[in-house]
C-alpha cells in the first residue's frame, strides 16, 4: 500500500520521475516474486524474513540505484496479442539459452536487467487459440557487462529511442537481440503466467498513477481559475 500511495504522490508531481521510481522498484519486486514462484527462495521462518533468493545480487544492485530493469514484451508485429510474439529463445550446443529477435516501445529499455518473453515452443495445434501463449517462456537478460577498465560490453542493441509527446524523462526504446545469453525463469512454456505475475501488480500501479495525474490536473485547474 505504501508503494502504491507513493506512486500516486510522485505521479502528481512528475510522471517521468514516478516511472523511474515505480517501474524500477517493480523490477526488483518481480525478481523476488519470480524466485518465490519457481521455488528458488528460502525463508527464515523463525525470524520472519527471506533467507536467500535467486536474484539477490541483482535486487541489491537495483536497490542501491546502480542498475534498473525493464519488461520486454511488445514486438513490431505483436503487442496485446502475445500469442503472435516471434522473438525466439533457444539453447545452443552447451545448453546456454540465447535470445534472438526484436522488441519495441520498451520503457527503460536502456536498463541493465531485462525480463524478456520469448518463444521456445512452436504451436502444435493451430486450431487452439491458446497454443501461441503456451509456447512462451520468461527469461532474464543482462543487457551489458561493466568491464574492469571502466568500459562496457553491450549484449542488447538499442536501435533507437522513441520520440514522444510526453514522458520525456523516461526512456522508451526499440531493441535487438542477436543470440544474447539469457537465464530461463521457471519452466519452458510458463512465460505468459510469469508475465501476469508482474503485469497484474503493474496495472494497480498504473491506476494509482492515473489518480495522481488527475489530482495534478484538478489542482492546476483550481490555480488557473483563481488567478
PLM-predicted stretches and their roles:
Residues 1-13, 22, 50-51, 81-82, ...:
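Alpha-helical interface subdomain recognition
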Residues 1-56, 60, 64, 106-109:
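Internal helix-loop-helix
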Residues 25-30, 38, 77-81, 105-108, ...:
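Flexible loop/turn segments at secondary-structure boundaries
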Residues 65-73:
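A short, Trp-centered hydrophobic/proline-enriched beta-strand micro-motif
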Residues 77-80, 105-107, 129-130, 164-171:
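Short Gly/Pro-enriched turn/cap motifs at secondary-structure boundaries
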Residues 87-90:
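A structural signal for short hydrophobic beta-strand segments in well-ordered beta-sheet cores
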Residues 96, 100-153:
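A short core secondary-structure module
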Residues 146-159, 164, 171-202, 220-227:
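A glycine-rich, basic-preceded beta-loop-alpha segment at the flavin cofactor/substrate interface
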Amino acid at each position: 500500500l505504501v508503494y502504491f500511495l507513493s506512486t500516486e504522490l510522485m505521479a502528481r508531481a512528475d510522471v517521468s520521475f514516478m516511472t523511474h521510481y515505480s517501474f524500477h522498484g517493480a523490477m526488483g519486486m518481480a525478481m523476488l516474486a519470480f524466485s518465490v514462484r519457481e521455488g528458488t527462495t528460502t525463508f527464515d521462518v523463525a525470524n520472519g524474513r527471506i533467507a536467500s533468493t535467486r536474484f539477490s545480487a541483482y535486487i541489491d544492485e537495483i536497490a542501491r540505484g546502480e542498475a534498473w530493469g525493464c519488461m520486454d514484451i511488445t514486438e513490431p508485429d505483436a503487442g496485446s496479442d502475445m500469442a503472435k510474439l516471434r522473438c525466439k529463445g533457444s539453447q545452443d550446443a552447451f545448453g546456454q539459452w540465447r535470445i534472438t529477435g526484436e522488441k519495441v516501445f520498451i520503457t527503460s529499455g536502456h536498463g541493465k536487467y531485462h525480463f524478456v518473453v520469448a518463444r521456445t515452443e512452436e504451436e502444435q495445434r493451430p486450431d487452439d487459440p491458446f497454443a501461441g501463449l503456451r509456447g512462451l517462456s520468461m527469461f532474464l537478460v543482462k543487457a551489458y557487462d561493466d568491464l574492469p577498465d571502466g568500459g562496457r560490453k553491450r549484449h542488447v542493441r538499442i536501435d533507437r529511442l522513441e520520440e514522444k509527446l510526453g514522458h520525456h524523462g523516461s526512456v522508451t526504446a526499440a531493441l535487438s537481440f542477436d543470440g544474447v545469453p539469457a537465464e530461463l525463469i521457471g519452466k519452458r512454456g510458463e512465460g505468459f503466467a510469469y508475465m501476469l505475475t508482474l503485469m497484474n501488480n503493474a496495472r494497480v500501479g498504473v491506476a494509482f498513477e492515473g489518480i495522481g495525474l488527475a489530482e495534478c490536473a484538478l489542482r492546476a485547474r483550481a490555480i488557473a481559475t483563481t488567478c
